[in-house]
């Protein structure tokens, strides 16, 4: 942060898939459950990990890799980690996908000095001109013509983006970006939305910040492909946590 660059706190979760044991198994793997896999679109058995990474000026560090065991919600896990973070000396951002865009988490990170930038579900309710409307419905109305959208470039790709500033359910005065790829303008299936709690940022700045969450996706993929996150055979929860710690160190060697 001495560079004056923002600190990014990046949060996401992943599932370390395992084979469901027989009902007769005497010593099944601890803390393994069925979890909804958004990647596979179905229930997946295994361990779910909540990962927190810190990034600044191109340096990315794995701050926490927490085993989720249903005794505490993922929202509470992230809130507890946020409360441990030192307050950054510069304006900084919490980056997440749509599953972590909640009023509780946004407020907790705000207290710690982090503005939230995250993906947003397209069924979220907005209040344009004080009228309650689903994000997807408003986007469909606006995309009848291009006039309300700006063509922006992010990482060499072009998108039509509409900028909304106002309230959401439980969230006041935020920026919401509606985004379509240039060649899929108006296609409901191509619509993506992003929330930003720092209204001073430009549209390009918001999108440029959001893509900085990509390292956590790379971390998950490399841990599964190279460091046996999907294939370790360890029974005890304590042993699993120890393995994850070694895995996290090995990833940066």
Enumerate the predicted regions with their spans:
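Active-site-proximal, Lys/Arg-enriched surface segment
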Residues: 1-59, 157-160
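Single, function-defining residue in the core of a domain
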Residues: 5-7, 18, 22-23, 57-253
């Amino acid at each position: 942060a001495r560079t004056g660059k923002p600190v990014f706190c990046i949060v996401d979760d992943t599932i370390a898939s395992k084979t469901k044991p027989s009902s007769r198994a005497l010593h099944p793997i601890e803390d393994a459950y069925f979890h909804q896999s958004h990647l596979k679109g179905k229930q997946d058995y295994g361990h779910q990990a909540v990962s927190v990474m810190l990034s600044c000026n191109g340096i990315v560090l794995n701050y926490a890799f927490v085993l989720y065991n249903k005794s505490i919600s993922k929202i509470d896990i992230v809130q507890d980690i946020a409360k441990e973070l030192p307050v950054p000396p510069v304006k900084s951002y919490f980056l997440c996908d749509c599953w972590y865009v909640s009023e509780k988490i946004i407020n907790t990170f705000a207290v710690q000095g982090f503005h939230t930038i995250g993906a947003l579900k397209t069924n979220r309710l907005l209040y344009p001109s004080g009228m309650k409307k689903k994000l997807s419905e408003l986007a469909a109305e606006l995309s009848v013509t291009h006039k309300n959208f700006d063509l922006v470039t992010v990482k060499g790709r072009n998108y039509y983006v509409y900028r909304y500033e106002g309230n959401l359910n439980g969230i006041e005065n935020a920026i919401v970006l509606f985004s379509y790829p240039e060649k899929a303008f108006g296609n409901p299936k191509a619509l993506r939305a992003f929330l930003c709690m720092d209204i001073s940022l430009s549209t390009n700045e918001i999108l440029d910040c959001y893509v900085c969450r990509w390292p956590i996706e790379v971390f998950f993929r490399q841990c599964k492909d190279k460091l046996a996150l999907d294939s370790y055979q360890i029974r005890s929860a304590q042993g699993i946590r120890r393995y994850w710690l070694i895995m996290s160190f090995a990833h940066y060697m």
